[in-house]
Curated annotation (Swiss-Prot):
Gene3D superfamilies: alpha/beta hydrolase (3.40.50.1820). Residues 14-115 form the AB hydrolase-1 domain. Involved in pyrimidine catabolism. May facilitate the hydrolysis of carbamate, a reaction that can also occur spontaneously. InterPro entries: AB_hydrolase_1, AB_hydrolase_fold, AB_hydrolase_sf, Pyrimidine_utilisation_RutD. It catalyses: carbamate + 2 H(+) = NH4(+) + CO2. Its EC number is 3.5.1.-. Keywords: Hydrolase. This is Putative carbamate hydrolase RutD. Belongs to the AB hydrolase superfamily. Hydrolase RutD family. The lineage of its organism: Bacteria, Pseudomonadati, Pseudomonadota, Gammaproteobacteria, Enterobacterales. Coiled coil: none annotated. It comes from Escherichia coli (strain 55989 / EAEC). The gene is rutD.
C-alpha cells in the first residue's frame, strides 16, 4: 500500500499518521498538513480500494483488516512507533491499531468517532445508501456535503462545493468498495474492548455534527481509561475542514501534551 511521508523536520521527529473517514482520501487532511509538518513527520495515504491504492475489496472487509494493512505498510516504511489521528471511520481504525499494536501506537486522536454506530448515524447512512442505489455515484456525492458541513458554510461556498463534487465523481471509489467499507464501519463495535486501550487519547468532536452526534464522543470518553475530550461549538462532521484554525490549535496542543504525558510515564 502506498504511503505519502513528509520529510522529518528534525532527527527522530515523532511520526503522526492521518487516517481519513469513509471517503478514504489522504487529501482530506490538507488543512492540517502545513502546521503538522513543522513539528512531525506526517504520513498520509489513500485507503485500500480508494485513490492511488486501487483494489477490489472482499465482501467481509473489516476495520481489523484496515488496521493491519496500514500497520504493515508503516513497518515496511521503517516506522515502528507512531501517533494516530483518525476521523470517523479513521478513528475506528485508530482504536483497532491501539488494540492490536499497543507497542507501536503512542497517542490516539479521535475526531468525531464512536464506540459503535449510533442509531442516528445508521439512519443517515441508510438514506445515503438508498441514494446510491437509486441515483448512483452522482446522488451519493451531491448529498455528501449535507452530512459534512454546516449550512451557512456551504451556502457561502457554492463554487467550491461544485468543484469538490466534480473531483469526487472523477475519483469515486466504486459502489462495491464503498458499500464494503461502509459495512465494515457499521459492524465495528468497540464497546466491550475500549477499556483495553492504554495509550493516551484526545477526543475532538463538533457539537453541530449532523452525522455523528457529539454524545458518541462522550460515550467514547467514558469508556477510554486515559482520555480527554474537546468540543468544538461549530464545524460539523468535517470540522477540521470548516474551522481549521480552531481544530489545528486543539490538535497541536493535544499531540504535544499527550506525547509529553506518554514520555513522562515511561
Amino acid at each position: 500500500m502506498k504511503l505519502s511521508l513528509s520529510p522529518p523536520p528534525y532527527a527522530d521527529a515523532p511520526v503522526v499518521v492521518l487516517i481519513s473517514g469513509l471517503g478514504g482520501s489522504g487529501s482530506y487532511w490538507l488543512p492540517q498538513l502545513a502546521v503538522l509538518e513543522q513539528e512531525y513527520q506526517v504520513v498520509c495515504y489513500d485507503q485500500r480500494g480508494t485513490g492511488n491504492n486501487p483494489d477490489t475489496l472482499a465482501e467481509d472487509y473489516s476495520i481489523a483488516q484496515m488496521a493491519a494493512e496500514l500497520h504493515q505498510a508503516l513497518v515496511a516504511a521503517g516506522i515502528e512507533h507512531y501517533a494516530v489521528v483518525g476521523h470517523a471511520l479513521g478513528a475506528l481504525v485508530g482504536m483497532q491499531l491501539a488494540l492490536d499494536y499497543p507497542a507501536s501506537v503512542t497517542v490516539l486522536i479521535s475526531v468525531n468517532g464512536w464506540l459503535r454506530i449510533n442509531a442516528h448515524t445508521r439512519r443517515c447512512f441508510q438514506v445515503r445508501e438508498r441514494l446510491l442505489y437509486s441515483g448512483g455515484a452522482q446522488a451519493w456525492v451531491e448529498a455528501q456535503p449535507l452530512f459534512l458541513y454546516p449550512a451557512d458554510w456551504m451556502a457561502a461556498r457554492a463554487p467550491r462545493l461544485e468543484a469538490e463534487d466534480a473531483l469526487a465523481l472523477a475519483h469515486f471509489q466504486g459502489k462495491n468498495n464503498l458499500l464494503r467499507r461502509l459495512n465494515a464501519l457499521k459492524r465495528a463495535d468497540f464497546s466491550h474492548h475500549a477499556d483495553r486501550i492504554r495509550c493516551p487519547v484526545q477526543i475532538i468532536c463538533a457539537s453541530d455534527d449532523l452525522l455523528v452526534p457529539s454524545a458518541c464522543s462522550s460515550e467514547l470518553h467514558a469508556a477510554l481509561p486515559d482520555s480527554q475530550k474537546m468540543v468544538m461549538r461549530y464545524g460539523g462532521h468535517a470540522c477540521n475542514v470548516t474551522d481549521p484554525e480552531t481544530f489545528n490549535a486543539l490538535l497541536l496542543n493535544g499531540l504535544a501534551s499527550l506525547l509529553h504525558h506518554r514520555e513522562a510515564a515511561l
